[in-house]
Every structure is written in structure tokens, then in C-alpha cells.
Amino acid sequence: MLEILLFLCVIIQRSHINAEITHVVSHLAETALRQDTNFQLLSQDIIAKKFPILDSSCVRRALSDFLPQCLQYGFETVPSDVRTQAAVKLSICELQASGVDNMPPECVGAVHFGACLRAMERTPQWWTTYSGNYQHLPSTCFENALPYEKEQLLSLFLNITDVYSNFQDDLVVDLEKYRANFEATVEASLRLMKASLMEGTHEIVNQLKDDLNYVNSKLADMGETITEHTDNVRTVFNDISDELNDYDMAGQIAHLKEDTMSLWQKINSDMGTYHDVQMSSLYNINAVFDTFYNRATESVQQVRTSVIESQLETLDLIADFNSLVRKSILPVLADELQPQLQEMSVSISRSLVGLSASYNEHLQAWSNRVNETLSEMESHLNNTMSQVEHMNDSIETLENKVFVLVSLGNALTTYVKWIYTFSRALISGYGIVTLIMSMLVVRYSIKLNSSWIKVLGRSTFILVAVVLGARTGSMLSY
């Protein structure tokens, strides 16, 4: 019963540990979800505040086709149709900005540049506006060079920002997948460990129950056997006392010897069987606990390996991204964009470092708890081994006592033989020679301690006195 209570305590402790680990996993999931930050909205706010140049304007749209060719290849390489379209668009922008109401219908809405140009030819004012814009196209090209370059640099920055934002979104998705995979792996490992523990514990408890029932049955059988043996010895002694007067003791002595030998053989056989059963039970218990410990160690190692690999992959992705950012951003934008990018990078690094530290801390705590529980189970197993060894010592002590009892039976058998021989010698009249021979036989055939020799001597003296008294009485009466 003591061993069963100990294993029930171990099972309760395991259930408590499983509940704590489930709580830790849920806490890690909440922590990972809190790390999700909408960097796309943050980048849009920063761009809207820092770069108002992105606001759309009529002049910028009018020069969208003309400026790239003029700045890259020179004004002379720009085709005439592109120049004409740029001049017409600038004229329309100028008229719209002046608030002119009677603009040519061909230049309103969806503009057809050929029709709009022919409509401007009909009015000197409009044609003057167009001609002035066409003549100032070379200076317009150089005047808008710096804003255009800034716009191109800003466009490059926005592209980099979009790439960074997409990378952040992908990183968040990967972290969420990693969290889900980690949680699923932990739950699967916990289910496997719980199933293995329950199976091993159930087998151990059943085996211990069977062993205890077997021991109890054997002890009960031994008690009944000893009781029967005691009753048999008592019956034999009564039969010996009844048969002394009839001088018929040889058959009873032989029967007693046969019963004693058969009982001794049966006890030896039962003791050997019980010893073999106990040893096999101990070996089975050791095998079950070794298997459980190996499986638990493999599961913990697999979880730890998967966590380390995921962290290394995350660090590699961050390192690759940092290298890409350093090599792609132009030196012109370093002074303007470095504070914002550095702040965002530090925020992400802190979030990832905090998440990694939290994972490592909780995983280490879980591993320590598993190791402590395994140590407690090992100590319980050692206590069980010591109790089984104590039972084995008790069985050996009982075996020695049974051996002493059998030796006493053999001594009593030899003593009865000697009494019988002595009585027959006295009756038949062989006299002192027979008495001396009988004493020599007893001296060299019985090997007991001094207390038993004293008891046998006194019994012999009383028996001789009784016989001599009976003979003397017969002679006096004669």
C-alpha cells in the first residue's frame, strides 16, 4: 500500500506540472501577439509629415514626361512632340491658375493636344502663353532639376520603406507560424509524455498490486503451513506418548521424518519461487523507468533544438535585411532618414530580443522542473528497492528459523530412537554395556547446544529412575 500511495503522489505532481507548462505556452502566445506593430501606418505618417513635396500639382504632372528625358539626355534630345505637349500642359496649368473662364473647349477635360494647340492659335493671348512656355522649356528643365531629383530620391526611399514594411509583415507572419508550430510541438510533446507516464505508472501499479497480492497469499500459505506443521508435531508427540507403552514407535518415527522432509522441501520451493518473482518485478520496474526517462530526455532535446534553429533563422533574416538596407540607401538620404530608421530598427530588435529571452527563460524553467521530477521518481524507486531488500532479509531470517525447527525435529527423532533403544535394553537385560553403547551413539549422532543436552540428560535420568523403580517394585513384590 505504501508504494501505491507514493506513485499516486507522483502522478498528481505530474498533472500539476502539465498545467503549469500549458499556462507558460499561453503566456508566450500572448507575448508574441503583443509584438505585432503596424509599421505600414507608422511609415505613412512619417512620410506625410516629413515630405510635403509628394502633394500632387498641375505643373509636376505637366512635366512628368519632359523632365526625365531632359535631365538624363539633355534638352536637345527631347522630341518635338514631347516639347509641344509639355508647353500645352504648362499653358493649361497657367490658365487654370489665373482663373480664366473662357478657356478653349478643346483644352478642357480629356485634352487632345493637336486640337488644343489649333484652338490656341486662334487667340493671340493664348498663343502668347503657349509660345512663352515653349521658349522657356530649357530653363524650366534646369530649374526643376533639384526638385525632380529629390522626388526621385524620395520615391526610392518609399520603395525601400515598402520593402521594409513587407519584410516586417512577412516576419510577423513567420513569427506567428513559428509560435503556432512551437505551441503544437509543445502540446504534442506534453501529450506524449503524459501518455507514456500514465502507461508506465499504470503498469507499475498493476505489477506492484500483483506482487503484493502474491506475497500476501504466500505469507498466508506459509502461516497455514506452519500452523499445520505445529499441529502435526503436537499430534506426533501425543502419538509418541501413547505409543511408548506399546513399544511400537518405528512406524511413527518414519512417518514423522517423511512429513518433516516433505514440508521442508515445499518451504524451500516456495521461497525460491517468491525470490524469483521479486527479482523479476524489480527488473521490470527498472526497465519501465529507464524507458520513460529516455523518452522524456529525447522530447526535451527535440523542443530545445527546434527553438534554437528558429532563433538562428530569425537572426539570419534580420542580418540579411540590415545588410540590404545599408547597401541600398543612398548617402544623400543618410542625414534625413537615419534617425527614423534607427529608431524603428532598435524597436524591432528590442522586441525580438525580449521575445527570445522570454522563450529561453520559460523553456529553461520547464526543463528544470522535468529534471527535478525525474530525480524525485528515482529517489522513490531507491526507497522501493530498499524495502524489497528488507523483505528479502526477513524471508532469509524465516528460512533460518524453519531450518532450526527442522533440526529440532531431527533431534527429537534421534532422541526418541535412543529412548526406545534404552528402554528395550533395560527390559531385555543387556545392562550397562547396552547403556554405554546407546550413550556413545547419542553422543556422536546428536549435535545440539548445551541447553538441549541438559534437557535430554534430565529426561533420560527421569526415565531410568522410572524404569528402575518399576523393576525394584516388581522384585520387592516378588
UniProtKB/Swiss-Prot annotation:
Residues in compartment: Lumenal: 20-419, 478
Compartments, record wording: Endoplasmic reticulum membrane; Nucleus membrane
Keyword flag Oxidoreductase: no
Keyword Coiled coil among record annotations: no
Topological category with respect to the lipid bilayer: Multi-pass membrane protein
Assigned GO CC terms: endoplasmic reticulum membrane; nuclear membrane
Cytoplasmic topological segments: 443-454
Major location category of this protein: endoplasmic reticulum
Leader sequence segment: 1-19
One of the protein's GO biological processes: nuclear membrane fusion involved in karyogamy
Membrane-spanning intervals of the chain: 420-442, 455-477
Keywords associated with the record: Endoplasmic reticulum, Glycoprotein, Karyogamy, Membrane, Nucleus, Signal, Transmembrane, Transmembrane helix
InterPro entries, sorted: Nuclear_fusion_Kar5
Glycosylation sites per record: N159, N371, N392
Protein function: Required for nuclear membrane fusion during karyogamy.
PANTHER family (alphabetical): NUCLEAR FUSION PROTEIN KAR5
Family: Belongs to the KAR5 family.
The protein's name in its UniProt record: Nuclear fusion protein KAR5
Organism: Eremothecium gossypii (strain ATCC 10895 / CBS 109.51 / FGSC 9923 / NRRL Y-1056) (Yeast)
Gene: KAR5
